[in-house]
Amino acid sequence: MSVETFTPAPLHFTQGAASKVKTLVDEEGNPRLKLRVFVTGGGCSGFQYGFTFDEDVAEDDTIVEREGVSLVVDAMSFQYLVGSEVDYQEGLEGSRFVIKNPNATTTCGCGSSFSI
């Protein structure tokens, strides 16, 4: 009898998010840009997500690649994001990158604030 161990990806970068990052990077004309996801203190639930584009990668950053583009997370933020999904959604309320975080015990209606 064999036993298989399943190790989930530490961070899931969806096809939709990667496609949007690729479009935005192409529009900027700078292939060195990467989507940086970070967590800061604040928001109505204690922590909040942030997104920015960055050319630099620190030694302790985690990098997830998909479709030729990269998502980058700093070491401090990564501990709060393990197992999360980074996606891109378009709807009546507008378009935005979103994080589905299984570690969050409380989230705010805005979708960008959470607590653990």
Curated annotation (Swiss-Prot):
PROSITE patterns: HESB
Cofactors named for this entry: iron-sulfur cluster
Pfam families: Fe-S_biosyn (PF01521)
GO cellular component: cytosol
Residues binding iron-sulfur cluster, per UniProt: 44, 108, 110
Family (UniProt): Belongs to the HesB/IscA family.
Subunit comment: Homodimer.
PANTHER family found in the cross-reference section: IRON-SULFUR CLUSTER ASSEMBLY 2 HOMOLOG, MITOCHONDRIAL
Listed name of the protein: Iron-sulfur cluster insertion protein ErpA
Recorded name of the encoding gene: erpA
